Amino acid sequence: MSWWNYRRQAQILQSDYQVILPVLDGHAGSDRPFTSIRDNADAIIAWIDYFCGGHVCLIGGLSLGGQVLLEMLSVRRDICRYALVESASVIPSPLTHALTAPAFGSSYGLIRNRSFAKLQFASLHMQQALFEDYYRDTCLIQKADMIAFMQASTAYSLNPAIAGTAAQVHLFAGEKENRRILRSADAICGAIPGSRLTVLPGLYHGGFSLNDPQRYAQTIREIAVD
């Protein structure tokens, strides 16, 4: 997933807000390899400092992007007024982390096979309209980057400094997510005073932003005027 899974939301919101869709390091269209979640957080904070005076109204993030957002909130308590974190894991998975390199080492070549890509895409429960974006970008990601950000994601744990964030944090997870994501959502909510957790019935990983852009955009409007 990348900027394109927020494309429709941006189109809906752009009449009222300036919407910026960053590309995380190592993803298709990025200008440098992936190094760490913290490095991505620092880079986005630096961009906001330079172009936005150090503060924006709202930041949203899904999965790896949600982890980057959590790190940003930990590093800069007032980086945004509102934060929307979706399907972010903060419970490390040592086994998955250890298996990432050998698994991608043996199967990386398959990602350019459309039939295999369609099977992978179906397992993600994403709307069909996003397949071409998914396939194009997946084919452009280097193996080293894919391994790097998968390992970073499976090793990520919540920065204790998150408790000091000044942002109003809204957490979303799908009812049908795996247990690690649901447990993570509870852990994040418990770590951030005043945060709000919504578990969305019937949804899988990232299903809120990926498959219901109208509702996601409306939620942003409601949060931003709360």
Stretch-by-stretch model annotation:
Residues 39-57:
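Conserved acidic catalytic loop of the alpha/beta-hydrolase fold
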Residues 203-214:
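Catalytic histidine-centered segment of alpha/beta-hydrolase-like enzymes
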Residues 165, 171-173:
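Short beta-strand/loop motif that positions the catalytic acidic residue
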Residues 61-65, 69:
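Gly/Ala-rich beta-loop-alpha elbow adjacent to hydrolase catalytic centers
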Residues 94-96, 110-163:
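Conserved alpha/beta-hydrolase catalytic His-Asp/Glu region
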